[in-house]
């Protein structure tokens, strides 16, 4: 991620790819992680750049949402220098086990069904729009955070307000 020589090689590859794609009448879409050092690189015009706006929390972290409004603002500020940008959002979430850092991915429907089975009502987090709840099953106490349709709509609205224009969204789902 931080190997700038490797990034420079990638950008040379991308320039060649864009020329070949143009000759063939094809579009190019490049997916970038939030950790991409865009401030140190000069990405060429011609591709659609899709920025991953998720996995703020996940396996190996404490429980939390896939994204929150502050994270979305950071991603926007960092990547707005790119031409032709769109944003990737992810539904679903994670179930964190007892220790708080081991997490398993889950779909939004699975999380909702788990809450119903456990007899708990998920709460909506104000800083992210995501839903969360904890439950006990036997001797284990798990915590679930997930994004539903309302969460995705809030994240899309947040990005639209930041850009001041219509944003293009790619939806990642399990």
Can you say where each PLM-predicted feature lies in the sequence?
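Polysaccharide-binding and catalytic clefts of secreted carbohydrate-active enzymes
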Residues: 1-5, 139-142
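Substrate-binding surface in catalytic domains of secreted glycosidases
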Residues: 3-117
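Short, acidic/polar
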Residues: 33-40, 147-161
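Generic serine detector
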Residues: 35, 86, 127-128, 134, ...
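Glycan-binding loop/region signatures in secreted carbohydrate-active enzymes
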Residues: 91-155
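Acidic/aromatic/glycine-rich contiguous surface patches that form carbohydrate-binding/processing clefts
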Residues: 155-174
